[in-house]
Amino acid sequence: YVARIVMQNIIKALSKPEDTAMVSIFVPGELLTAAGLTPYSVEAMSCFIAGTQCEQPFLRKTEEEGFPETMCSYHRVFLGASLTGLVPAPKCMVYTNLACDGNMMTFPYLKQKQELSGFYIDVPYEKNEDSIQYVAGQLRELKKYLEDMTGKKIAESAVQQAVANSKQAAEYYSRQLALRKDHDPVSTLTNELYAIFMCHLLAGSKESVTYTKLLLEDVKKAPKGEGLRILWMHMMPFLQQPVKEVFNYSDQMHISTCDFVADGFQKVHHEDPYEAMAEKMVNCIYNGSVGQRIEKAKELAQLTEADGGILFAHWGCKGTIGASGLIKNSLEASGLPTIILDGDGCNPANTSDGQVSTRLQAYMEMLKEAKSHDTLCL
């Protein structure tokens, strides 16, 4: 189900650009759902392109434009695809400074280069009520902007319904998460990646509610396995062969939860729909101090009774790479064996399959031994 929905989103974005909005991953999908626009993000489109194994020409195009190789590969592939015309110009773009510094290069550049209309959401570093109200005010302006771009009024009832859908999806997700310590559904890295799009790009849609409801039912039916439970942190390298071999349809290792997805399906408490969307943005674990990422990881590990944690340090993601040592040390101090897996979720040229395979296999053996003896010497 979720594969079909995500593919339909990409197809619509490519075939009907006049009805699409180019967005960064943390932009509230609820308002775009209410506006009737098809959102697509840098990460979603680049994953789709990389999945067809044709990312290299677009990476070269981006280099020709002067962008550094150290920039996030998701953004570099997307820029190249946009500049060569593969990704058609959208009706508008909506972006934010939240989490990814690549946003502040990609979106302003394409806005000027392709003369696109754009809306920017500024999310403060501080996590408090003032920040929530500040962002909520911008989201009310975003609604007006989308009305101007589409030429259609957005009913307040549509916004309220979209936010209500998000809250329902978050409830279903929370319920299945609580069951994970006793149920181990067999899945794939790609399915886990799709979940990221459902909690952000398609937030507020009926499809997101259906997805989380089906996920809950699948988890309920799944038996408890003998394999290792893993807390995954950050993006999914769904194309990398050694990672696929370890996790796809495996009864040896299960991704019990991913912090990126759990954060996207976080529970919000404000009743006002704009304040609720703002709360989700401000309280995002990738905003502010790394301390919240660490605490969220500990919470998820305890809830799912994870045997270990894997932090994927994606090429060019300066925030995650810079914080990786602190995250690893903090989690291991709390008793969760953690490995930092360096790689690239979009460009296979930036990683070594052999090295990744060796490290993953060694880590898996270490966790198996620890589980069999119910102890681990760090």
Which residues are covered by each model-predicted region?
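Acidic/His-rich segments in extracytoplasmic proteins that coordinate ligands and/or metal ions
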Residues: 74-148
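Gly/Ser/Thr-rich loops at beta-strand to alpha-helix junctions
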Residues: 21-30, 97-103, 233-240, 315-322
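A charged, amphipathic alpha-helical module
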Residues: 1-19, 136, 140, 144-267, ...
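Peripheral docking tails and interdomain loops at the edges
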Residues: 325-378
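Redox- and metal-dependent alpha/beta enzyme cores, enriched for Fe-S-associated oxidoreductases
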Residues: 31-60, 231-302
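C-terminal hydrophobic structural anchor segments
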Residues: 288, 293-335, 339
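Glycine-rich, highly charged phosphate/nucleotide-binding loops
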Residues: 65-84, 285-299
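N-terminal signal-anchor module of multipass membrane proteins
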Residues: 1-46
